[in-house]
Amino acid sequence: MINIFIRRGGLIVRESLYSSDEQIKVFHEEDKILWIDLFRPSSDEVNYISQTYHLEVPTKEEREEIEQSARYWEDSGSITINTYFLVRSLESELHNETITFLLRKNILFTIRYSEFRVFDEIQQIVLATPKVFEDGFDLIGKIFEIRVEKDADLLESAAKNTRALRKRVFNSQVINYDEMLEELSSLQELNMSVRDSLFDKRRAITAVLKSDKADADVKKNITIVLKDLNSLVEFTAVNMHALDNIQTILTNQINIEQNKTIKLFTVVTVAMMPPTLIGTIYGMNFDNMPELHWDFSYPVALVIMILSTIFPIIYFKKKGWI
């Protein structure tokens, strides 16, 4: 599907094409296209836009490359940006997906293959406040601004959950290590995904600021977004350090529990050695063992074996080993 946002008079209107057979209508001379959003476009739709506006649309392989030259490039007439945006999958898991932004003749082209809330919001804002958006640079600046705000909300929620997890680790009487490790892993994955997304957007915004195609007002607004990005990158580092600290604490507690178990088995083994030795001696059944012929030899042997078990346990108890 192709959504086209056109400035018409004092308003911005949206026209949608749902089929590759449709063609972009011939607009009046006073009409001005601001934004063409390609949502899950077919190859025919991509080719049509590419040929109509003389765009070099990156392939799927080029979109996923991580080199700086593949994430941002600029020529005499256009700017191309491939950058990560977080999206929630059908399994409600957050992951990064590449969105392509192309700027040519002050028109913004976006190519995406998933539904992003930020695009729904920006479309409503564009239609509601047409005076704010003069060209594609204003649009891309607003898109990054809204996405960074959402990233900040995600990090704030992650930090809150991290603090709650830390309290549970210290205060819980009975610790479910499997559950806590699973939650810890989930928080670490979220933090890394947000960090990767922030790093990628920061590279893109830094490159736009160096471009002579963006005017002073656009650069001023994007600079504010960049400052917010830098703050969030620092926040992810702090949050990751807190998560690493929790992981260390959990690992130490697991080791302590394992050591307690090993110590218990060691004490039991040592405590059972004397009675085992006694039982082994009197189980040899040699003829010249007068104790075996006593009437009370069996109860005496049992008492000795019990006492030889109790004394080591008392000793270990005084030492604080059990």
Curated annotation (Swiss-Prot):
Q: What reaction gets catalysed by this protein? A: Mg(2+)(in) = Mg(2+)(out)
Q: Where is this site: Essential for ion permeation?
A: N259
What Pfam families does this protein map onto? CorA
User: Motif range for Probable selectivity filter?
Assistant: 283-285
Q: Which residue windows are transmembrane per the record?
A: 264-284, 296-316
- Where is it located? Cell inner membrane
Q: What is its main location?
A: membrane
Which topology term describes how it sits in the membrane? Multi-pass membrane protein
Assembly and binders: Homopentamer. In the absence of Mg(2+), interactions between subunits are weakened, and dimers, trimers and tetramers can be observed in vitro.
What is the similarity comment for this entry? Belongs to the CorA metal ion transporter (MIT) (TC 1.A.35) family.
Q: What does this protein do?
A: Mediates influx of magnesium ions. Alternates between open and closed states. Activated by low cytoplasmic Mg(2+) levels. Inactive when cytoplasmic Mg(2+) levels are high.
Q: What is known of its domains?
A: The central ion permeation pathway is formed by the first transmembrane domain from each of the five subunits. Mg(2+) binding strengthens interactions between subunits and leads to the formation of a symmetrical homopentamer surrounding a closed ion permeation pathway. Low Mg(2+) concentrations trigger both a conformation change within each subunit and a loosening of the interactions between subunits. This results in an open ion conduction pathway. In addition, this results in a less symmetrical shape of the whole complex.
Protein's name according to its UniProt entry:
Magnesium transport protein CorA
UniProt gene name:
corA
